[in-house]
């Protein structure tokens, strides 16, 4: 398996930031009320990951280890602010829906994690591909949760798509369920927790069936991997790509 394919398989499935590492769950649970909001925040997060990873990789030789976290935050803040202004200018309705969750991308631990784990140790190309794969993995997770919650909680799919992609895409809007058949619980955060739990269980079941599950815990803070072999715990350093 080539390195590029491995990066995307890890980002989309094996090391999905939302379903495996369980990072950045606050926006995942809060903003996935419908599919369009989920796609909007997911793509914004993906752009932040790509741009911040590329920038940090370009200047990695000039970043002192003791000051790396403040530098990451400054770079990520600049990227998020730029994307926030673009969304406000060209997709104002989406901007109003996402609200505070766009600026909160700055504090999203997924972004800082990839910067410190990948971007500062690898080439620009690898850093960009890593940001793209991790971002798409998070976007797909949010889209799945948002679609399920919108269908069950509101009986629709792609509500408000014309505000993001234009009137020509209004035909994608679907009324799946009658308004009297919806289950409003899933439109609230408690429903988001329930759906996330079901999705996590489904992914773990598929991993077991396909035989691709890895019984190991990754410590994001120390970049260590705890590998369990024959009941014994062995600590190994995680290698960069």
From Swiss-Prot:
Belongs to the NqrDE/RnfAE family. The complex is composed of six subunits: RnfA, RnfB, RnfC, RnfD, RnfE and RnfG. The chain crosses the membrane at residues 22-42, 69-89, 91-111, 124-144, 157-177, 182-202. The keyword Cell membrane applies. InterPro entries: NqrDE/RnfAE, RnfE. This is Ion-translocating oxidoreductase complex subunit E. Its main location: membrane. NCBIfam families: PRK12405.1 (NF009070), rnfE (TIGR01948). GO terms for cellular component: plasma membrane. Part of a membrane-bound complex that couples electron transfer with translocation of ions across the membrane. It is found in: Cell inner membrane. It comes from the Bacteria. GO terms for biological process: electron transport chain. Pfam families: Rnf-Nqr. Keywords: Cell inner membrane, Cell membrane, Electron transport, Membrane, Translocase, Transmembrane, Transmembrane helix, Transport. It comes from Buchnera aphidicola subsp. Baizongia pistaciae (strain Bp). Its EC number is 7.-.-.-. It is a multi-pass membrane protein.
């Amino acid at each position: 398996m080539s390195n590029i394919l491995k990066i995307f398989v890890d980002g989309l499935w094996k090391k999905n930031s939302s379903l495996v590492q369980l990072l950045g769950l606050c926006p995942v649970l809060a903003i996935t009320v419908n599919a369009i909001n989920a796609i909007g925040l997911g793509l914004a997060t993906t752009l932040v990951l790509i741009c911040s990873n590329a920038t940090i990789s370009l200047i990695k030789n000039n970043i002192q280890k003791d000051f790396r976290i403040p530098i990451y935050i400054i770079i990520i803040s600049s990227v998020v602010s730029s994307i926030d202004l673009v969304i406000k200018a060209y997709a104002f309705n989406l901007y109003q829906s996402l609200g505070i969750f766009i600026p909160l991308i700055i504090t999203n631990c997924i972004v800082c994690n990839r910067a410190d784990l990948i971007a500062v140790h690898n080439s620009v190309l690898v850093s960009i591909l890593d940001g793209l794969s991790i971002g798409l993995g998070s976007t797909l997770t949010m889209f799945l949760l948002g679609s399920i919650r919108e269908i069950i909680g509101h009986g629709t799919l792609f509500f408000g798509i014309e505000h993001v992609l234009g009137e020509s895409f209004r035909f994608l809007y679907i009324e799946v369920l009658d308004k009297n058949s919806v289950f409003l619980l899933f439109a609230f955060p408690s429903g988001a927790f329930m759906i996330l739990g079901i999705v996590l269980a489904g992914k773990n079941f598929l991993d077991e069936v396909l035989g691709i599950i890895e019984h190991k815990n990754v410590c994001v803070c120390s970049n260590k991997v705890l590998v369990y072999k024959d009941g014994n715990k062995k600590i190994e350093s995680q290698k960069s790509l």
